[in-house]
């Protein structure tokens, strides 16, 4: 489904939609930590992650020559999953040292970086 959305609307719009879904996740988690909000946040997190991961991965292979695509995607997957594993393993420590609200605020920093890099790529593409 995400691939069809990318073909219809383009990589950037799906990435912005993914950031928006992540922002809903952060806001839902930030203000109340009850089970319902947690469940809603997980649903938006799943869709946001899917939109960002699929659009980013499909955009990555477009920037390489045909004979480099598989190596680039393999290296990208290694980096993404290594960072994901590190974040998962360190989340408990980070939560113990800070708070749930702080963790959500840190997510906003990464969302802003994604928006800025996507905007930059859009501006370069238009030139």
Question: How would you name each of these model-derived features?
Answer:
Residues 10, 31-33:
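Helix-breaking motifs and short loop linkers at transmembrane-helix boundaries and internal kinks
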Residues 93-111:
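A membrane-interface helix-boundary motif in multi-pass transporters
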Residues 68-96:
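A late C-terminal transmembrane helix in Major Facilitator Superfamily
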Residues 51-64:
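Intracellular juxtamembrane helix-capping segments at the cytosolic ends
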Residues 25, 36-44:
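Paired small-residue
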Residues 1-11, 95:
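Helix-to-loop junctions at the C-terminal end of transmembrane segments
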Residues 13-27, 108:
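Structural signature of the two symmetry-related core transmembrane helices
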Residues 108-127:
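Multi-pass alpha-helical transporter architecture, strongest
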